[in-house]
Amino acid sequence: MSIITDVYAREVLDSRGNPTLEVEVYTESGAFGRGMVPSGASTGEHEAVELRDGDKSRYGGLGTQKAVDNVNNVIAEAIIGYDVRDQQAIDRAMIALDGTPNKGKLGANAILGVSIAVARAAADYLEIPLYSYLGGFNTKVLPTPMMNIINGGSHSDAPIAFQEFMILPVGAPTFKEALRYGAEIFHALKKILKSRGLETAVGDEGGFAPRFEGTEDGVETIIAAIEAAGYVPGKDVFIGFDCASSEFYDKERKVYDYTKFEGEGAAVRTAAEQIDYLEELVNKYPIITIEDGMDENDWDGWKALTERLGKKVQLVGDDFFVTNTDYLSRGIKEGCANSILIKVNQIGTLTETFDAIEMAKEAGYTAVVSHRSGETEDSTIADIAVATNAGQIKTGSLSRTDRIAKYNQLLRIEDQLGEVAQYKGLQAFYNLKK
């Protein structure tokens, strides 16, 4: 009764109006699962391949009909007949069917859509929530949210190099209250921006994209918003960055060129100067997490940054690790970073995603489950964050339904877990000396 009888993919749109995949999996019992695939704007060069059509006459070349065809005509034939509960076997079968190291033949987007839909169908068959199916009886930790309330870099037209300025409501007693803290700060920030005559339009991830005078101006404005909402910076709420440094790293000159986003007169920093600058910001402001502070291929820079700041700040590898256990394993051995960002479409299956989270935890690294800038209404990452007791999630600002869908799902999960639910707050940063 739990045998897969049909697999079907279609092309749908993501939050940027670009095509992506939606996959449906059906079983003999009538149990059903649907998965939608996100897409990134700033992508690591080592990520699994997102298969696009390349036909400029259709969606500017971004169509996904090739990936849709691969699901409907190749993957479906291979996995029909499998027990929908055998997630690992199905994921491994798709990896083998693709046969490339980066899923470039079938497309990570095709494979991931099926992987998510299979898990949802299995949960539906067992009549249990997705987080319970994926995580088992010990599922209980609601994640501390990283709320991206200022968008810069490749996610907006704002003249700021850093891609994300985030707030983390670590002092809240529950996830529900953490969400309230964030929403109140978001609205306080909007009032401050309006009072300064700055833009309040939002970027890809729902954060504001104003023309600040620089990084420090952005941070100080966020601190003012935290205080205006009635909270204490560095106690109730901390600040985090996603520098997305690979987006402004000049490989030929081996410098971090802030002029790419901030214009003429902006800083151009060596790796050592980049580390000095990040340390300066950490010493000046209540910053608890920095993502991709160095370029994805700057292993020496990552090691030096970790030696300098790794005991006091969470240093998250996104483009650096691309949710890949090979890169994470090397980072652990070489003492680079102390946390990994988990993006399901960087690696392409739920099985490999869970492998990366497990490896990180075993090494004492934290794991931050994350969205992409091109999202959908699919809320699977909320269930993954709780299923793995990851303790942290990054899923955008307090606007745009594609972001709020994940927060609302976490509210439902917290309600369903009842007294068992735990919100760790600051304890989610278990590898830092507080």
From Swiss-Prot:
CDD domains: enolase
Gene3D superfamilies: Enolase-like C-terminal domain, Enolase-like, N-terminal domain
Annotated catalysed reactions: (2R)-2-phosphoglycerate = phosphoenolpyruvate + H2O
Top-rank lineage group of the source organism: Bacteria
Ranges in a coiled coil: none
Any one of the GO CC terms: phosphopyruvate hydratase complex
Major location category of this protein: cytoplasm
Pathway(s) of this molecule: Carbohydrate degradation; glycolysis; pyruvate from D-glyceraldehyde 3-phosphate: step 4/5
Residues that, per the record, bind (2R)-2-phosphoglycerate: 163, 343, 372-373, 394
Cofactor: Mg(2+)
NCBIfam families given in the database record: eno
PANTHER family attached to this UniProt entry: ENOLASE
Protein name, as recorded: Enolase
Organism field: Streptococcus gordonii (strain Challis / ATCC 35105 / BCRC 15272 / CH1 / DL1 / V288)
